[in-house]
Swiss-Prot record:
Keywords: Repeat. The keyword Flavoprotein does not apply. GO terms for biological process: chorion-containing eggshell formation. This is Chorion class B protein M3A5.
């Protein structure tokens, strides 16, 4: 989340973001005022959960010549008719 807006006065923001968090202040603070950032993340216990997904199935490039850029020389079944080695180098 990035903002290039100018905020004056007291600004309160709350909610959840999908990352730990950062704060950046650029520019100069006026000499007649103050500026600060108060940042907290609950009790300090950060949990990242995994939602959804298919697990260890036959996924993108996971098959032996059957997926997109699969492993080995899987002629006819891979993307573009050639399975490739799966590393993206074109071989």
């Amino acid at each position: 989340v990035a903002s290039e807006n100018r905020y004056e006065g007291t600004v309160g923001v709350s909610g959840n973001l999908p990352f730990l968090g950062t704060a950046d202040v650029a520019g100069e603070f006026p000499t007649a005022g103050i500026g600060e950032i108060l940042y907290g993340c609950g009790n300090g216990a950060v949990g990242i959960t995994r939602e959804g997904g298919l697990g260890y199935g036959a996924g993108y490039g996971g098959g032996y010549g059957l997926g997109y850029g699969g492993y080995g020389g899987g002629y006819g079944l891979g993307y573009g008719g050639y399975g490739g080695c799966g590393c993206g180098c074109g071989y």
